[in-house]
């Protein structure tokens, strides 16, 4: 089972890659850093604050196994939400305004959920 040992919200001094959306965390940007232990292995998990927040808002953690939410599942869940809510039947695709990288998508979904 996954255990969170520590969670901090530092400001990036160097570029990182978000474990959820696979996009860059830029220097100067605040992000989430978790120190976790799973199956006896201690590791750090870094993600955008917005990605962590949208994962909670969309209840992505509810169907996780003992290892927690991974990036592939996060991106798949985010794609499913956008497809379900922003599908354009005329183009047989999501609306062009939603055809963005997963970090931008997470920010757009959060904004949308906060306006509901």
Predicted features along the sequence, with ranges:
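Short, intrinsically disordered terminal segments enriched in charged and Pro/Gly residues
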Residues: 1-9, 61-116
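Short recognition patches in nucleic-acid-associated and regulatory proteins
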Residues: 20-39
């Amino acid at each position: 089972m996954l255990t969170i040992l520590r969670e901090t919200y530092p400001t990036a001094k160097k570029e990182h890659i978000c474990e959820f959306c696979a996009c860059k965390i830029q220097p100067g940007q605040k992000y989430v850093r978790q120190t976790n232990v799973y199956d006896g292995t201690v590791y750090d998990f870094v993600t955008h604050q917005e990605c962590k927040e949208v994962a909670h808002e969309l209840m992505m953690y509810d169907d996780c196994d003992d290892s927690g939410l991974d990036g592939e599942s996060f991106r798949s869940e985010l794609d499913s939400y956008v497809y379900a809510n922003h599908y354009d039947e005329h183009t047989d695709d999501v609306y062009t305004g939603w055809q963005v990288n997963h970090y931008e998508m997470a920010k757009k979904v959060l904004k949308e959920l906060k306006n509901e």
